[in-house]
Amino acid sequence: MPETPSTLDRDTALLERLLGDVLVEQEGPAFRDRVFWLRERAAALRADPSAPDGDELVQAVRRLSSSDLGPVVRACSVQLQLSNIAEELERLRRRRAHDADDQGPQRESLAAAAAATAGIPQSRRAQALADLDVGLVMTAHPTEATRRSIFDHQQRVWALMEHLDDPRVGPTRRRALEDELREVLTVWWQTDDVRARRPRPDDEVRRTLLHVESVLYDAVPDFLAELESTLGVSLDDDRAPEGKGRGGRSGRVGRSPIGFGSWAGGDMDGNPNVGPETIAETLNRHRRTALRLLGERVDALAVFFSQADDRVFVTQELRASIERDERQLPRVTFPGASANEPFRRKLTFVAARLDRAAQGGEGGYAGVDELIADLELLRASCSSSRVAHGRITRLLAQARTFGFIVAALDVRQSAGPLQHATAHLIEGYADADEAGRQELLVAALSGPPSYVPEPEDEEARSTIAGIAAVGRAVADHGPEAIGRLIIAMARQPSDVLCTQFLLRHTAPDEHGATMRGVAPAVPIVPLFETVDDLEGAEATMGDLYATAPYAEHLQRCGGSQEIMLGYSDSAKDGGFIASQWGLYGAQERLVAQADAQGISVRFFHGRGGSTSRGGGPHHRAILSQPPGSVRGRIAITEQGETLSQRYPHPELAVRSLEQTVSAVVLATLTPAETPPDRYRSALDDLTRISRETYRALVFEDERFPRLLHQASPLAELSAMNIGSRPAKRGGTTGVDGLRAIPWVFSWMQNRLLLPAWYGTGTALEQGDRDLQREMVEGWPFFRTIVSMLEMSLFKSDLGVAERYLELVDDDVRALWEPIRAEHERVQSVVLEIRGTPELLDRTPALQRRLAHRNPWIDPLSHIQVALLRRSREGDENAQGPLLSTIGGIAAGMRNTG
């Protein structure tokens, strides 16, 4: 359905007007006029880059003191966040209008997937739904730049704008709602937008759970109901494989085709702030949250279920269950629930058992399976009426999806510390080569456990304690507590085997002692990150599959191997196209290898928010995966920066979930065809040329690290309290040691977005243009590459980026010419392939939305350049407003990294 510009423009204009009112009240009319004058100059410069407005804008910024620039930055940043809210409300409006107009299935919807697979036998469609296993893993983005307090104010604006959108609202109520908006905007304006301290892991845990509590917990039942009704099959079908649910980690009664995980509080990779205590505290918080959410809904259901005994059918099983509860929980009282209200009586016992489970008291539920069994007894008694398909079915969906843990905690550690710890436990390990290490590990895993004194090395002790926390978590909370143990920078079989050894070494027995001799059944997931590691993944996994102790561990974990693919570091290592093609080829080889050995494999895609980190719409990305690589099973990271974009409202959360799951259904039932050899040859050439071009600049030109540090706020990021994890690995200062996220963040800030496109122009220019157009039309993978390039080019801005050259050394400035030429080259080729005069001409609604933000982002960029110069010259007053420009540009670009 085409976008309705009038409603989006109306909302944006309203929010601009209301913010202007607040600025007048708080800072005076002259300040408001200054802010909007800067916006108008930026808009005029966009319309005519040769106009004098650019110099006027720069001179106006230079005339203002650093202290005076601070409030200007705040105003632009708040308006950009308000514009984002207006865009999200427009998405919601379009979804509702589409449903009301009944104009056929919406693009990327479950209904569209059902229509596309209508010719497939119902039995196959039912089996595809039974096989669905979609894991969405939330991460605490290290550069997620929105404070919790600001997030809360954004939610209030969202709700008030939604009320204003109701056509039944009259003039009096409208004025009252606008006054409420002014009040919220006033408090927002008076709130610091930069944290007073760097967030701790527990802050990130709370923020991650907030998205579940406020949106996802109630959106999931709606989505699952839509999934069943649209595809015409039941999620209660007993053909679901053993252990399905929560991304394949739970053996609960019933199942959910989607499951949620989290890295917040469990990601130890390079983060000294996460350790065994953090893991334990995080899971305790997860459990408390899960039981509270379930308890609140059971209490509400008990109030609602007031049916009298003589007016409903009550199964003998339910009556027996109530009698059993009365014997086991004799002290439970029934305020307002009489003996002739069996459903309410049962739900009172359910609430009591949940409360006891939360308190660790006698009589509480041992696990969520027991709760589900009780709810199923209630639903069976309601089976003859519509009551069975309402609130109780919603509660069952929530119990099956979120369980007693809300989201399984993933634990991640880098291969280096794991190997270092193992070397302190196995004699001769440190000096052995890879073959020798594998031999030592197989011997240690095959024989009985032996006592090894705790090492004196502090790093080794810390790593061992972190792995021990995994075993304790499973013992304390059950297998659903830990989603997976991820090995970052995995390169060789010993990286996985040493992790298995450490799991076994620290495994607790029923008394809490270690050395039980059997590692907990926690999936060990290698994360292949660089281009070279992706190429070597097949050999690594082949050796592991052939290793008896690991094969046994795999069987105890359900017989399925999960492999994580790193988009961020592979792109930093080899450039955009080399990363994408390397990931594609690795999946093809790993699927063929697993199929040959009868092993089921699921890929965990570590996508970021930006294009250069694999970001973009899930639907398109899933459909571009190699044939046979999905088969109903996939896991995807949901970066902290994108959670509020994908799940800002329950209805939009349903839309995001259906876009993801519908793509999995389509990729399973109608997989893409294997690309012909001429396509492969073309991609091989593109990869080789683009990687050589990219690395020649990024890794081989000694001036490049200075360009990165001088022409971006990379150094200043370390002072900004926007993540619990350091920006660099170890103490290195070059590109190699820089984490992929701040690497991308820096190029997003200076508007160049270099990692997303550099090298691709040279490669594409040398290719066959007719073949490239054919590939765009006939190959989803290449079509996605071109679409992502087009988006990145549109978001980049060489005119703004060139302003940052004022900050660099003279010899470094010489790098600008090849960068500018490559940008022009790739843009020219993309337009030739697309056959359009301008970028994003085929998606005018998106083009208009992105362009609409620029007049508010551009002043921030000019101010950032001025403040970077002043800060580096020693102006202490520049630091605060400078950090605010970082958050404002991130909000406007809708990406941090």
Region spans (language model):
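Structured alpha-helical segments in the cores of large, soluble enzyme domains
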Residues: 119-122, 146, 162, 167-192, ...
